[in-house]
Amino acid sequence: IARMETAGATIVRIESNETPPDFWGASRLVLDSEFKVFLDAYLSGSPADIPVRSLADLVAFNNENAEVEQAIFGQDIFESSLEAPEMDSDTYQDALALIRKTTRDDGIDALLRDHDVQVLMGPSGPVSPRVDVVNGDVWPAWAGAGSMAAISGYPNLTVPMGTVAGVPVGVSFMSGRD
C-alpha cells in the first residue's frame, strides 16, 4: 500500500460489507448448478476416444476406480453438482438473484459509489492450507476479497503480494461493470 501511495495512488480504507445469512449457501448452489452444465458441455465436445462425456460419467469412472481416483479425497463436490437444481429452476434463479444483488448492487458497485473510488483492493484469499489426508483441506471462514469479484462476474486482477510461511499470497484489484 505504501508503494502505491508513493506512486501517486490515493488509498481509502474501507471496512468490508456484510453478506446475508444465506449468501454462501446460495453461491454454492449456483456454483454447483453451473459447474454441472458447463462441465457437461466441455466433456461432450471431447475427442471421441475419451469415454467420459459428462459429469455423471466422471463420477461413475471415479467410483469404478476409487482405489486410485479417490485414494485420498472423495468427490463430494462432483456429487453435489449432480444433485444441484437446473439453471432454469426457480431455486437456481432465486439464488442467482441473491448473489448478484449481494456482490454487485450491494457489494462492489455500492463500495465504489459510496467511497468514490475507481478500484477496490484487498487480499485475494487466505493462505492455502496444507494438504491434510485425515481432515481434508481446512480453510478459514474468511474467503478473501477475490471471492466477491469471482461470484459477481466482475473484473478481477490478482497479482503476487508476497509469501506467508513460504506460501504465495496475492492481492486482488477489482472494479464494477462500468
Model-derived features: where do they sit?
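Gly/Ser-rich, acidic/histidine-flanked active-site/gating loops
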Residues: 1-49
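Phosphate-binding glycine-rich loops and adjacent basic patches that engage nucleotide phosphates
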Residues: 2-3, 22-23, 55-76, 105-112, ...
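Glycine-rich, small-residue loops and helix-cap segments
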Residues: 79-178
